[in-house]
Amino acid sequence: MKLSEIADNAGSRKKRMRVGRGIGSGKGKTAGRGGKGQTARSGVRIKGFEGGQMPLHRRLPKRGFNNIFRLDFAEINLDRLQEAIDAKAVDAGAVINAEVLVAAGVVRRAKDGVRLLGRGELKSKLTIEVYGASKPAIAAVEKAGGTVKILAPVKDEGEAA
């Protein structure tokens, strides 16, 4: 085998078809676009356009609104917290709060704080400070001998929400 004898597999590099270059090519005149009209023209189709029929997004009623005061909590379950303690990423003896969890990489970012959820089992006695917790999560922490302190969320302006 020589370097000059190396070739691509048959059909692995297909030549690009140039369209609209005469009827003899097989892709002339309409260039594979069918007949005339809007679909034969260049440009983006009108999204949601249904040929003049009232589009679905206008037939359905408007619902809801975006609450500008909505708080965005990072959620963490008990099983994930226990994994972090077992992996020594979080110290079980210290107070566990949003800053500790973000620094340990347990939660990616805590925009308005952390909310504790009750999936999984907890074996360690913990002192946790979070901005929200489900009743099963609080019960599981207290069953393991720990405490949960619920903090008041603080908005960007520095006032309590």
Swiss-Prot record:
Record GO terms (molecular function): rRNA binding; structural constituent of ribosome
Compositional bias (Gly residues): 21-37
InterPro entries in alphabetical order: Ribosomal_uL15, Ribosomal_uL15/eL18, Ribosomal_uL15/eL18_sf, Ribosomal_uL15_bac-type, Ribosomal_uL15_CS
UniProt key word Cell cycle: no
Cellular compartments per GO CC: cytosolic large ribosomal subunit
Gene Ontology terms describing biological process: translation
Region annotation (Disordered) ranges: 1-44
Keywords associated with the record: Ribonucleoprotein, Ribosomal protein, RNA-binding, rRNA-binding
Domain of life where this protein originates: Bacteria
Record-stated family: Belongs to the universal ribosomal protein uL15 family.
Role: Binds to the 23S rRNA.
NCBIfam families: rplO_bact
HAMAP family: Ribosomal_uL15
PANTHER family, A to Z: 50S RIBOSOMAL PROTEIN L15, LARGE RIBOSOMAL SUBUNIT PROTEIN UL15M
Subunit structure comment from the entry: Part of the 50S ribosomal subunit.
Protein name: Large ribosomal subunit protein uL15
Species the sequence originates in: Rhodopseudomonas palustris (strain BisA53)
Source lineage: Bacteria, Pseudomonadati, Pseudomonadota, Alphaproteobacteria, Hyphomicrobiales
Name of the gene this protein is made from: rplO
